Amino acid sequence: MPLGKLITFVLLVHVSHASASSLFEDNTVLEINLTGPISSLFDDVNSNKQLPFVLRTNDLEHTIKVRVRGKSRRRVCSFPPLRLNFAANDTVQSVFQDQNKLKLVTHCRDRGSVHASTLKEYAAYRIFNLVSDVSYRVRLLHITYTDTDGGLKEKEFDRYGFLIESASALAERVGGQAEHVTGVSLRSLDNQQAATVYIFQYLIGNTDWSLVTADDDDTCCHNGDLFDIGSVRYYVPYDFDLAGLVNAPYARPDPSLRISRVTQRLYRGYCISTDVLMDALSTIKARRVDILDVIRQLPGLSLKETVATIIYLEEFFVRADDENKIVKLFERRCL
């Protein structure tokens, strides 16, 4: 990011800091207990019904409303993502202060390596945080679920999950506003952010994104949000469960892309100047150690998964050692 923009962001973050919640300013694992009618909530995953739950953490108790969320994951997950709705007067002087509606990414399935996909998707968000300030922050949770209905195989069980910063909180933090439009002009995008997104998606092996509105979406863009900051728009990606880095058990590439596995990298960025691509590549390469440390520091990830994930990321960095070659690849493949 150019120095002028960096200084602007630092000032904006400083101004909004006083009203920000501590929830996303801490990277330690937050222990919570979520108690409620889980099996009733999952009776009809296509419903948006909200049910009362109790969330306990740090010796505090919050009465919240919970509903199922997500699109594709409702279809493939036995334990789909959730939305937690907090009462405004119930979060004062807690880690959830100033929070209202929060997205919770859950473990999805209990098969195989239960925690691996969740932890690696969390890592994808953290990696993007390292290369762009305009990104969704996340907080890792270790959750004890208690089903008061007793309709699940286990009444009480522990899983990892993570919370995602809301779009309104991100907008306030960076001094911008969320945009809900049906399309976006490439000329309206911040070039540095756009190039960083393109290369980041290639780094994590994610092809499940686009600057075009998807068939089942009302607004632009597929698996990304737009934010107006100053006179330009910033594309902020989310939903990385189909990325090669995560390699979720249910992940399959779009048949039109002509790749057989999600772990195969395919550049899906749009055409942009060589200088901007080089700058974005340098930004990502400069965080190589920090990026790999995100994986090394994941709690609950097996040694086998940790090594395999680091090797996957290192494959990118080895290719990126020849900057001219990889940028030429990007330019040949750009849309």
Label each PLM-derived region with a short phrase.
Residues 1-2:
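N-terminal secretory signal peptides that target proteins for export/translocation
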Residues 19-335:
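Phosphate/dinucleotide-binding and metal-coordinating scaffold of catalytic cores
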